[in-house]
Amino acid sequence: MSEVIEGNVKIDRLSPGDGKTFPKTGDLVTIHYTGTLENEQKFDSSVDRGSPFQCNIGVGQVIKGWDVAIPKLSVGEKARLTIPGAYAYGPRGFPGLIPPNATLIFEVELLKVN
């Protein structure tokens, strides 16, 4: 099931979560993710590192695409997020890894909301 939200961020739900525990603005979340460019070139993966990523969601600690998409997921849910450049790293990109204005694709699993 696909859903397009703010900023043309697309959420493709891969497997359901608990359906009731959704992060709210400012919550600490624990996420496993793999990030790729549209050409499928991987640029980062918490899965490969064997260490989930933690951040406070909705408060600008991460790219805007995550801030708007992660609160739509429930604990345990896996999803593919397609995030246009304006809601990712924008015109600056991330030198050496992500070109300017690149659309990013993340496979994410919301492990925990603290």
Swiss-Prot record:
Residues 26-114 form the PPIase FKBP-type domain. This is FK506-binding protein 1. PPIases accelerate the folding of proteins. It catalyzes the cis-trans isomerization of proline imidic peptide bonds in oligopeptides. Belongs to the FKBP-type PPIase family. FKBP1 subfamily. It is found in: Cytoplasm. It comes from Eremothecium gossypii (strain ATCC 10895 / CBS 109.51 / FGSC 9923 / NRRL Y-1056). Its main location: cytoplasm. The lineage of its organism: Eukaryota, Fungi, Dikarya, Ascomycota, Saccharomycotina. Its EC number is 5.2.1.8. One of its GO terms (biological process) is negative regulation of homoserine biosynthetic process. Inhibited by both FK506 and rapamycin. InterPro entries: FKBP-type_PPIase (IPR050689), PPIase_dom_sf (IPR046357), PPIase_FKBP_dom (IPR001179). The keyword Isomerase applies. PANTHER family: FK506-BINDING PROTEIN 59-RELATED (PTHR10516:SF443), PEPTIDYL-PROLYL CIS-TRANS ISOMERASE (PTHR10516). One of its GO terms (molecular function) is macrolide binding. One of its GO terms (cellular component) is cytoplasm.
